[in-house]
Amino acid sequence: MIGMRRLISSGSSFEREIGYSRAVVDGDWVFVSGTTGFDYEAMTISDNVIEQAEQCLRNIEMALAQAGSRWADVVRVRYILPRVEDFEPCWPVLRRYFGDVRPAATMIAAGLSDPRMKIEIEVTAKVHVEL
């Protein structure tokens, strides 16, 4: 796997317009871009931060699967939210995905590129290897 670089797309128009990949597999690492709660097929987004968090994680899960990775392989997660007070309501959803994995984590308060976006999640993982 060393030396191989593979680009993963979600089909989002944002990827074409901005010039990035949903994820990049480089060697045995998977780097998933900051992912928002857009449903990329419908290009819609909920106004509810908890629903957005759930959709973010579904979008990330698809990218991880295409990369040959899974939740147990995630080593780092970054959460970016414009409103700090929106983070705690998301904890039950985040715990469902990361509770047993317990990756290194950071939460950052910052503006996002679209005012409808309430949370963005980025992960780094290893390519899954069966032992």
Regions found by a protein language model. Give the residues of each.
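Short, polar/acidic, helix-capping and beta-turn segments at strand->helix junctions
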Residues: 2-131
